[in-house]
Amino acid sequence: MSDHHKVVLVTGCAKGGIGYEYCKAFAEQNCRVFASDISQRMQDMADLEPDKIETLELDVSSEKSVASAVESIISKCGRIDILVNNAGIGSTGPLAELSLDAIKKAYEINTLGQLRMVQQVVPYMASQHGGSIVNIGSVVGQVPTPWAGSYCASKAAVHAMSNTLRVELRPFGINVVLVVPGAIRSNFGSNSSERLVNYDWKLYKDFKEAIVERARASQGGKATDATVFARHVAQKVLSSRPPKQIVFGHMTGLFAMLSWSPLWDKYNLVVEYVIKRILLIFKRKFNIDNQSLKGDNAGSAGYDIAHILLDYAKQQLRQEQQS
């Protein structure tokens, strides 16, 4: 089948997200695109061009919903050539205090949601002797960052799952492409941060601003435009030889360097980068001395975000002793 007539299913396509842009990018390449999202967000796909893109309800956390959506496409087209596993949610907060329900939800959607889609689509792709599965990972799936351990872990699982599937599905002519986005401009960060504004942290209540800042970290001024990103991915996926990985977007160079660094050095660099972004917040909150982030501490294997917590604890203890 020609690339101009490929049937593409994309999950998580509400307007404002990257999935919405994937749909438009594949449609520009004359693919038959099926955009999907949960029932509450169906209206957010209403202005996708109906002559090029069809919309349908799909909840990746529900096996019944996934099966129904896939069967609907098969009944209309007889095949699915490309699956873009884009649906996902943010999960921000310190692991020691983030609720297990929130962590489970991140895995349910970000990781198991992709696997549910794969298990429903693969039998059809195998019968047609070909297809491409495009799993959306993240740079933090390779290099985890503070305050986002749950999200990082869910994406790390996607990376491992994709690399395994690539080998297991090769005998059936099915390509597996792992997309590793950097900082891409979308509503993802704002949606995540809004959920955190009124969260009642206990141990970390004084770090609330820093945690919210982490949720917005991917949406800085230099974030890559989502349209540019989606077009790049679509072009690569539709090529005669799709790559195993597509790494693209702001900050991917930094994270690629960190992923090849020795573990101790990688962690220091990640923490120092995060510290630079949130240091002003910390200084306002805790009056931390810049010298505590320099000198011997910065080069030691034991230096990590815990030093900031320790500095704060020491300051609190001194204040209590003086009062």
Predicted regions and their residues:
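Canonical Rossmann dinucleotide-binding motif of NAD(H)/NADP(H)-dependent dehydrogenases/reductases
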Residues: S2-F34
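The beta1-alpha1 cofactor-binding region of Rossmann-like NAD(H)/NADP(H)-dependent oxidoreductases
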Residues: L58-S68, L100
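Substrate-binding pocket helix/loop in short-chain dehydrogenase/reductase
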Residues: P94-L95, A102-K104
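Active-site helix of classical SDR
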Residues: V118, S154-A157
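A short, exposed helix-loop element centered on a Lys and neighboring polar residues
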Residues: V118-Q119, N163
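Residue(s) in the substrate-gating loop at a strand-loop-helix junction
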Residues: S138
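C-terminal beta-strand-loop-alpha-helix "lid" module of Rossmann-like NAD(P)-dependent dehydrogenases
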Residues: R170-G220
